[in-house]
């Protein structure tokens, strides 16, 4: 959703800075409300709140679709709508992350459950970008936002139908929102496993994986080829290949047994994903405009990009699933919403980090920006090596 909003802005302005700004506005809005969302998840009925947030997302996306369809879109309007979507998502994500554990009766299946939950999300990463890239090429961006709006509406209806047994472990004494938020933060700060996993997750998404938000700029070189403008198709292919890699990683993770040291797997996959994204950015520097013009579909640039983004998707998916599994297994029930809400800021870092990435890309290039950002993350990894938490025990 943020990628296609970014593409709309990039098509209007041609600015990598504004492309990164749109994504970061969404991410910052999400981060601001994540803390509130975590407290709400621990205080109130999650299912009802999820229905409300799903309907709010559907209405907001419908407005964006109508604005785009009637050619009223401006950078300011898109940024405003993305900020609203970010605020809604900030409440929505902690609810989603904390509610699904209520559906698991046998906690020994939590690794497979987290992998399956992630698999559904990653599955949409395959269908949505692949179809979206080609749909945009032939029908434009409005149809994408209409479809997204319909998806959230269907989700709200499904939630109304689903029955589930909510956790009965609610805080008996309600404190202020600030005190309850600080309680979650203090817990993370004092627990080494939670502290290290969450910091690693933030750094990885903020410094390494935010390159995804610049895909519209990275594929800009395919606008002028002998086949015409195929940038949207290439964008769809790259995002879909990354999604296929992520699904593959989730399938691999679902086979992992609880007795295996999840801590070592988490850290190892984190390092590998950063290295692969570095080489993905490097592959986009190996460009020959003349060769891309004549043979875009078999160019060395596209071939290497596909390979690196596929394996980056695998390693990053394993990292995400293993890290979430460790947290879900260890978090106290009365703090689950707040702690997991703070962890979901991880996914906001993916978009928030795009602002700095976009600024670098504006003055240099998207490829150089991706390479330098992952190089910085590689240095941060040295600080992570002191932890090899078991997690799976």
Regions found by a protein language model. Name each.
Residues 4, 139-146, 186-250:
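A single, central transmembrane helix in multi-pass transporters
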Residues 7, 97-103, 217, 321-330:
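Intracellular helix-loop hinge segments at the cytoplasmic ends of transmembrane helices
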Residues 11, 127-147, 221, 353-370:
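Transmembrane alpha-helix termini and helix-breaking/packing motifs in multi-pass membrane transporters
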Residues 20-25, 34-35, 43, 47-49, ...:
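C-terminal transmembrane bundle of multi-pass solute transporters/carriers
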Residues 85-123:
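Cytoplasmic helix-loop-helix junction between adjacent transmembrane helices
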Residues 151-173, 382:
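Helix-loop junctions on the cytosolic side of multi-pass membrane transporters
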Residues 167-198:
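Juxtamembrane intracellular "pre-TM" segments in multi-pass secondary transporters
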Residues 378-393:
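Positively charged, low-complexity/disordered segments
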């Amino acid at each position: 959703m943020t990628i296609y909003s970014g593409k709309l802005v990039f098509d209007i302005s041609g600015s990598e800075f504004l492309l990164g700004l749109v994504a970061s506005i969404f991410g910052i809005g999400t981060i601001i409300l994540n803390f509130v969302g975590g407290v709400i998840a621990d205080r109130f009925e999650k299912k009802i709140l999820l229905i409300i947030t799903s309907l709010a997302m559907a209405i907001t996306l419908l407005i964006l679709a109508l604005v785009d369809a009637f050619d009223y879109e401006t950078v300011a309007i898109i940024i405003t709508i993305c900020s609203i979507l970010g605020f809604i998502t900030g409440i929505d994500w902690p609810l989603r992350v904390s509610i699904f554990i209520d559906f698991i009766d046998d906690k020994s299946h939590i690794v497979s459950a987290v992998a399956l939950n992630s698999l559904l999300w990653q599955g949409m990463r395959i269908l949505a970008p692949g179809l979206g890239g080609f749909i945009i090429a032939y029908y434009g961006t409005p149809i994408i936002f209409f479809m997204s709006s319909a998806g959230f509406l269907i989700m709200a209806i499904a939630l109304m139908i689903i029955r589930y047994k909510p956790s009965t472990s609610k805080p008996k004494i309600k404190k202020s929102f600030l005190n309850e938020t600080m309680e979650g933060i203090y817990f993370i700060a004092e627990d080494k496993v939670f502290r290290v996993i969450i910091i690693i997750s933030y750094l990885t998404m903020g410094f390494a994986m935010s390159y995804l938000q610049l895909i519209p700029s990275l594929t800009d070189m395919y606008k002028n080829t002998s086949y015409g403008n195929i940038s949207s198709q290439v964008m769809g292919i790259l995002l879909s290949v990354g999604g296929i890699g992520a699904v593959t990683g989730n399938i691999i993770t679902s086979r992992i047994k609880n007795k295996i040291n999840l801590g070592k797997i988490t850290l190892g996959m984190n390092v590998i994903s950063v290295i692969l994204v570095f080489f993905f950015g490097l592959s986009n520097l190996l460009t020959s405009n003349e060769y891309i013009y004549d043979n875009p579909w078999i160019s060395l640039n596209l071939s290497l990009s596909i390979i690196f983004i596929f394996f980056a998707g695998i390693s990053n998916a394993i990292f995400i699933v293993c890290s979430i599994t460790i947290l879900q297994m260890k978090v106290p029930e009365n703090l689950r919403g707040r702690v997991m809400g703070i962890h979901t800021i991880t996914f906001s870092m993916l978009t928030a980090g795009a602002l700095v990435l976009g600024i670098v890309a504006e003055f240099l290039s998207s490829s150089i920006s991706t390479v330098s950002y992952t190089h910085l993350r590689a240095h941060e990894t040295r600080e992570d090596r002191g932890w090899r938490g078991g997690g799976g025990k």
